[in-house]
Amino acid sequence: MVKSICKCTALCGSSLLILMAAVSAQASDGQVEFTGSINDNACTISTENVKKSVDLGQVRVGDFANTVGATAGSVPFSISLENCSSATLKNAAITFRGQQSSSDPTILGMTGANQVAGVGIQINDARTGAKLPLNTASTDYVLRPQSNTFDFTASYVRLVADTEGADGKPGVRGIGTGQVNALASFDVTYK
C-alpha cells in the first residue's frame, strides 16, 4: 500500500510539474498597439495630385502686353478628389498657398536662386476664368459621390512694366529671361 501511494504521489507530482510547465509556457506578456485617425474629410486627394507638376512651357517676353497684370502661356491643370461621400459635407473649396510675389501678394512668386525677374504665376478658376488669389479659398464646388475633379489654369503674369528711355535711348525691360520655378501647396476645405 505504501508502494502504491508513493507511485501515485510520484505520478501526481510529475503530472503537476508537466501541467505547471505547460501553463507557464502559455503565459507570455505581449502588447498590441492600435493606431489610426478620425477626420471629417469628405474625400481623399487623388495620389496623382499629392505631388503634381505643371509645365507652363516657354513664352517670349514679347508675348506679354506692356501692362502690369498681363498674362501669357495659360495652361490648364486639375485637382482630383476620390472616395467622396457627401453624407455630411456637401461642398469643397480649394485654397492655394505659397511664396507670395513681392510685387503682388495675390500672385505666386518665384522660388530658388537666379529666377526670372518681373513675372509671377497666376492661378485662375477654370469655371469662371476669375483670378484665384493666393491664400483665398475658391468659391464652393458641389461634391459628387466618389470622384470629383476641379479645373484651374496657371499662367505667367507680368508684375513690372517696361520703362521707356530718355532721348531715344532704350528703356528698361520689366521682365527678365531665364528659368521659372514656383511651388504652391493647396488645402481642401469641406463644408
Where are these regions (language model features)?
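Mature extracellular/passenger domains of Gram-negative fimbrial/pilin and adhesin proteins
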Residues: 2-8, 23-191
